[in-house]
């Protein structure tokens, strides 16, 4: 008799965005002629950079000819993209990586969810709260999170990110084995300074903590004093794995490409105390479970690092950040408190009074016909907030703000 992984049964029946879809579908049934504007799920709307499109066309043509055909590629990624990543994303910031420390993948979601494969099931977990749901759910699946009680997992240490602490959590007074950090932050849209990030690196060095650092939105940072990589902090290579994505940087949500940096000097321990390089373990995991990102996709990603590609990516980011400014100004004009939207494409909106996240979501849906994401879906500290994204079309963002202003003013 085959037995199931019963940890999966601990997961709530529905993923956050499935619950939202159900409520939206119920609304559409009762209001079939109403035009909804969706500012909830963070999917992009701008086309791919032209340089990427041309590079992928060329790659397809290469696959059509025997002389230039490519079959299986290296599980770690092609050298041409790894070199482009190191030269453009890290070297200019004084961070020097070896090619063997960068692993090309099909996206940050896959890697943040799969990294637990190389870590023991009984490691203690610390997460900023609110948080991207994948971090929690992937740990539930492997038995690391414990039992869900009153919206919290029993074996997870929650580090509240509140307006009172500028959405940067306090250093815990206990030791944590694995710590998830995401900056610029999803869902709050806030950032962390070098001084604050240095505190976390020092904590990790002192406590032998592994930091899993999600920097998927670093390209949206506008403030020159905000770090783009945790490796800008001295000592971080000894304690941190960094995840990045081309999804929001270059519109690759439907193409799928990202990468993970695992420094060779980063180690973790066996029960007997032997130190094992995590780079070696991740490489072994990828060689077994991943057959590499497609050649076509990697050529498209490489193209964003050309001079013209950089211009086109910058234009895409500026478009979304202009949306964020328009939205933030409009929302604040109604008296709402709004966080984020300055160095990230997310706005974290406080519901008026003591209104709950789901109530605020439903009011916005039924009164303004705008779809957001209830903050409590990202964790207990998200209660009373809603997340809006700036990834929509300009006209939709402007119309959504008109509707919300009309509703609230």
Curated annotation (Swiss-Prot):
It catalyses: (2S,6S)-2,6-diaminopimelate + 2-oxoglutarate = (S)-2,3,4,5-tetrahydrodipicolinate + L-glutamate + H2O + H(+). Pyridoxal 5'-phosphate binds at residues 72, 108-109, 132, 186, 217, 245-247, 256, 291. The keyword Transferase applies. Pfam families: Aminotran_1_2. Substrate binds at residues 15, 42, 109, 132, 186, 291, 387. It is an enzyme of class 2 (transferase). Pathway: Amino-acid biosynthesis; L-lysine biosynthesis via DAP pathway; LL-2,6-diaminopimelate from (S)-tetrahydrodipicolinate (aminotransferase route): step 1/1. Belongs to the class-I pyridoxal-phosphate-dependent aminotransferase family. LL-diaminopimelate aminotransferase subfamily. Involved in the synthesis of meso-diaminopimelate (m-DAP or DL-DAP), required for both lysine and peptidoglycan biosynthesis. Catalyzes the direct conversion of tetrahydrodipicolinate to LL-diaminopimelate. This is LL-diaminopimelate aminotransferase. It comes from Phocaeicola vulgatus (strain ATCC 8482 / DSM 1447 / JCM 5826 / CCUG 4940 / NBRC 14291 / NCTC 11154) (Bacteroides vulgatus).
């Amino acid at each position: 008799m085959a037995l199931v992984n019963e940890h999966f049964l601990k997961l709530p029946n529905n993923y956050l965005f499935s619950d939202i879809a159900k409520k939206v579908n119920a609304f559409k049934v009762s209001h079939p002629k109403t035009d909804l504007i969706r500012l909830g799920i963070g999917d992009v709307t701008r086309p791919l950079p032209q340089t990427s499109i041309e590079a992928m066309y060329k790659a397809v043509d290469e696959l059509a000819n025997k002389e230039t055909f490519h079959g299986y590629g290296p599980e770690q990624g092609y050298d041409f993209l790894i070199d482009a990543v190191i030269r453009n994303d890290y070297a200019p910031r004084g961070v020097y990586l070896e090619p063997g420390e960068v692993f090309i993948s099909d996206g940050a979601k896959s890697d943040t969810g799969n990294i637990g494969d190389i870590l023991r099931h009984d490691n203690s977990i610390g997460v900023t709260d609110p948080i991207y749901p994948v971090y929690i759910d992937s740990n539930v699946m492997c038995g690391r999170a414990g039992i869900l009680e009153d919206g919290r997992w029993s074996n997870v240490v929650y580090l509240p990110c509140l307006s009172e602490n500028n959405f940067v959590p306090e250093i815990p007074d206990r030791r944590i084995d694995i710590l998830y950090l995401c900056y610029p932050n999803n869902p709050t849209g806030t950032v962390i300074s070098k001084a604050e990030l240095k505190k976390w690196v020092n904590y990790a060095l002192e406590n032998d903590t592994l930091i899993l650092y999600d920097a998927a939105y670093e390209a949206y940072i506008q403030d020159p004093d905000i770090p783009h990589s945790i490796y800008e902090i001295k000592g971080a290579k000894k304690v941190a794995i960094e995840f990045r994505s081309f999804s929001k940087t270059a519109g690759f949500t439907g193409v799928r490409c990202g990468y993970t940096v695992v420094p060779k000097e980063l180690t973790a321990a066996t029960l007997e105390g032997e130190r094992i390089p995590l780079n070696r373990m991740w490489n072994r995991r990828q060689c077994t479970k991943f057959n590499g990102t497609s050649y076509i996709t990697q050529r498209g990603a490489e193209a964003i690092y050309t001079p013209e590609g950089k211009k086109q990516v910058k234009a895409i980011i500026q478009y979304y950040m202009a949306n964020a400014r328009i939205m933030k100004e409009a929302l604040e004009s109604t008296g709402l408190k709004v966080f984020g939207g300055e160095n990230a494409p997310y706005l974290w909106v406080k519901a008026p009074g003591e209104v709950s996240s789901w109530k605020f979501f439903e009011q916005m849906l039924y009164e303004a016909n705008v779809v957001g994401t209830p903050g409590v879906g990202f964790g207990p500290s998200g209660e009373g907030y809603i997340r809006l994204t700036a990834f929509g079309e300009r006209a939709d963002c402007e119309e959504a703000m008109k509707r919300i202003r009309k509703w609230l003013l």
